[in-house]
A protein has these predicted regions:
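Solvent-exposed, non-transmembrane regions of membrane-associated and secreted proteins
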Residues: 20-261
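N-terminal Sec-pathway targeting helices
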Residues: 1-16
Length: 261
C-alpha cells in the first residue's frame, strides 16, 4: 500500500511539474513575442518624428508631404514626418501610419492579400502573435473608399489597438477627439464620432453601401456610441473604423469610427 501511495504521489508530482514547466514556457514565449514586437517598432522609431512635448500639449502631428490637403485648423496641428521610402524598403505592404495622442498607438499600417496574415505577423512580415495594425484587404490603399477599416489586437501589454478601449469613457474622448492618419500622398485627421461594442454579426465591418444604406449605418453607429460627439457625418463623408477585441461577452469587438478630414 505504501509503495502504491508513493507511486501515486510520484506520478502526481511529475504531472504537476510538467504543467508548471509548460506554463512557465508559455509565459516565456508570450513575453518573448512581446519583446520582439516592441523591439521591431523601436528599430523603425527613427523613421517618424513626433512633435515635441510642450507645457500645453498640442494635438499630434506630422510635416505634410508635398501636395497634402490643407486642413482648416492646420495651424493647431503639428504633423509628424514619416519616411515611407525607408519603411517600404522593409515591407512594400506598408500603406500609412496612425497616431493617437494619449495612447501607445503610433504604428505603421500594412495591407495584405487577406485579413488573416497580419493577425500573426509584424509589419516587417516576421511571424509574431502580436500581429500588427492592418487595413482591410477589401479597401483601397489610398483610403478613398466610403468606409475603410483597420484592425489591431487588444494586447495585455497595452500595445496595438488596446488604447482605443479608452474611448469607452466620455472624458477620454473629450480630451482626444482626433487621430492622425498619414499616407504617402496626404494627411488626414480622423475626427471620431462613434465608438461602440459590436458582435461579429453586426454590420460594423460592411464595405459596400448604397448612399441610403450608408446614411442609416452612420446614424446607427452614432446612436450606439459610448460617447457623445458633436460630429454628424453625412453620406458623402469617408469613414475610417478602428477595430479590436473587447471582453464584454464572447467574441465582442470594440469599433471606433471617425470622419476623414
Amino acid at each position: 500500500m505504501k509503495l502504491k501511495n508513493k507511486l501515486l504521489l510520484g506520478g502526481l508530482t511529475a504531472v504537476l511539474l510538467a504543467v508548471m514547466s509548460f506554463s512557465a514556457w508559455k509565459i516565456w514565449a508570450i513575453r518573448s513575442e512581446y519583446h520582439a514586437g516592441e523591439s521591431a517598432y523601436e528599430d523603425i522609431s527613427h523613421m517618424i518624428s513626433l512633435p515635441q512635448k510642450t507645457a500645453e500639449p498640442q494635438p499630434p502631428v506630422i510635416n505634410k508631404p508635398a501636395g497634402a490637403e490643407t486642413l482648416p485648423d492646420e495651424d493647431d496641428t503639428v504633423w509628424p514626418e514619416v519616411d515611407f521610402a525607408a519603411l517600404r524598403e522593409i515591407n512594400p505592404d506598408i500603406v500609412a501610419w496612425i497616431y493617437i495622442e494619449g495612447t501607445k498607438i503610433n504604428y505603421p499600417i500594412v495591407q495584405g492579400e487577406d485579413n488573416s496574415y497580419y493577425l500573426k505577423h509584424l509589419f516587417s512580415g516576421e511571424w509574431n502573435g502580436s500581429g500588427c495594425i492592418f487595413l482591410d484587404f477589401r479597401n483601397d490603399a489610398s483610403f478613398a473608399d466610403r468606409h475603410s477599416i483597420i484592425y489591431g489586437h487588444h494586447m495585455k501589454n497595452g500595445t496595438m489597438f488596446t488604447g482605443i478601449d479608452r474611448y469607452k469613457k466620455q472624458e477620454f474622448f473629450d480630451e482626444h477627439p482626433v487621430a492622425l492618419l498619414i499616407t504617402p500622398d496626404k494627411n488626414y485627421k480622423v475626427v471620431f464620432f462613434a465608438g461602440y461594442v459590436a458582435t461579429p454579426q453586426d454590420d460594423a465591418w460592411e464595405i459596400g453601401f448604397t448612399e441610403a444604406e450608408f446614411e442609416v449605418w452612420l446614424q446607427n453607429a452614432a446612436d450606439r456610441s459610448c460617447f457623445t460627439s458633436e460630429i454628424a457625418p453625412i453620406a458623402s463623408d469617408r469613414i475610417l473604423t478602428l477595430s479590436t477585441c473587447s471582453y464584454e461577452f464572447d467574441d465582442a469587438r470594440f469599433v471606433l469610427a471617425g470622419v476623414l478630414r
